[in-house]
């Protein structure tokens, strides 16, 4: 079975093999803030970095990953422009923690959520915002999801909170391949990176697809249905198992915004 960080590497390899270039930028993206990625290996004697995925580079179809300076506004603005003029590539900007995206709020308001309406400018920029309350302090817990949801209108952006490796794989593959470019905001996991319950089978990557909603059926006829998203699902599931409750059904929302999400919730 695969954990989330492994699936993150798999989608990059698959996209490169399929001819889609990938570019990742963030303050700690090469190693990964939670020491989960390690896409650049350094020689301890020379300090030279080696990127294993670069072996899959073919001409302009290449993999690039950069550790950026500590200016969210500057880097996000640059990556927005990069994604806008480079439709064939998957461009990802990653906040070290989701909270830090507030420093770049002007870029989000002026360009990411409104450029299509104002100037007919499309962008497939993807934002990775590590999200979750794991006791790391008040500035390391929330990407202020409510602000992004307030900015949603007329399918201007996509907001997703995948909790399984297969979901991450299919979501980002879809973002790269889809010719209809829309900014994608992904609330990426923190503690779930190493949660043994948050794993996927290899077959889920090869045969599955991204699921907007995941329903965990109760063993008996359900008396209650609980709607949730993100890591809260695993907290609820643990409690259900601990109490041996068999009549509660959990419905997990993975796609929080596009009109498709609203239609599916109504159904």
Model region roles, listed by residue range:
Residues 1, 5-88, 95-116, 204-215, ...:
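Non-catalytic terminal/interface segments that mediate subunit docking, oligomerization
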Residues 2-7, 11, 257-267:
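Single conserved hydrophobic/aromatic residue that forms the stacking wall/gate
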Residues 24-26, 65-67, 91-93, 127-129, ...:
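General beta-strand structural signal in soluble alpha/beta enzymes
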Residues 34-37, 101-106, 136-140, 169-173, ...:
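A short acidic (Asp/Glu
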Residues 93-100, 131-135, 159-162, 167, ...:
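Conserved short loop/turn motifs at secondary-structure junctions
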Residues 102-104, 110-133, 150:
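Catalytic or ion-translocation cores adjacent to nucleophile or general acid/base/metal-coordination motifs
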Residues 121, 134-232:
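Active-site phosphate/pyrophosphate-binding segments
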Residues 247-259:
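Core nucleotide-handling region used for phosphoryl-transfer chemistry
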């Amino acid at each position: 079975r695969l954990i989330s960080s492994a699936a993150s590497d798999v989608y990059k390899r698959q996209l490169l093999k399929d001819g889609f270039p990938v570019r990742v930028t963030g303050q700690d993206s090469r190693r990964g803030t939670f020491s989960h990625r390690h896409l650049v290996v350094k020689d301890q004697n020379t300090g030279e970095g080696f990127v294993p995925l670069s072996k899959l580079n073919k001409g302009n179809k290449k993999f690039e990953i950069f550790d950026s300076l500590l200016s969210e506004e500057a880097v996000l603005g640059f990556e927005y422009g990069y994604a806008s003029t480079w439709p064939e590539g998957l461009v990802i900007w990653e906040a070290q923690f989701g909270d830090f995206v507030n420093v770049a709020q002007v870029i989000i308001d002026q360009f990411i959520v409104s450029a299509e309406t104002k100037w007919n400018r499309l962008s497939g920029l993807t934002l990775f915002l590590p999200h979750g309350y794991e006791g790391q302090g008040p500035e390391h817990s929330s990407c202020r999801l409510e602000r992004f949801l307030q900015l949603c209108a007329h399918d201007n952006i996509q907001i997703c909170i995948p909790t399984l490796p297969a979901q991450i794989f299919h979501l980002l593959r879809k973002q790269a391949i889809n010719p209809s470019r829309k900014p994608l905001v992904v609330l990426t996991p923190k503690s779930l990176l190493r949660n043994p319950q948050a794993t996927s089978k290899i077959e889920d990557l090869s045969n599955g697809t991204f699921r907007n909603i995941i329903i965990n059926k109760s063993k008996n006829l359900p008396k209650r249905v609980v709607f949730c998203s993100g890591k809260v699902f695993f907290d609820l599931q643990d409690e259900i198992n601990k109490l041996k409750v068999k009549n509660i059904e959990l419905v997990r929302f993975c796609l929080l915004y596009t009109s498709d999400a609203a239609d599916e919730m109504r159904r």
